[in-house]
Amino acid sequence: MKVKVLLFASLREVVGSSQSAVELEPGASVEDVWTRMISLYPRLAPHTGTIAFALNSAFTNPHEALHDGDEVAFLPPVSGG
């Protein structure tokens, strides 16, 4: 199945784009997308444990199952004053 990936802020800078797509086996989870992205872009690894996950525009947990055509977003922590 194919999943669209959205990346924001520092994650976008690491990948060099705000969007990507990955092919995964049926039954894959949001966490599997993150693992695949790390295999493609190893500099994402330090962000593990600090990012928020969204599935089809709603925050979710990393174990949520995916379906073909889903949109997964990875969001780093927001800071500022």
Predicted region positions:
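Ubiquitin-like/PB1-type beta-grasp interaction modules and other compact soluble beta-rich domains
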Residues: M1-G80
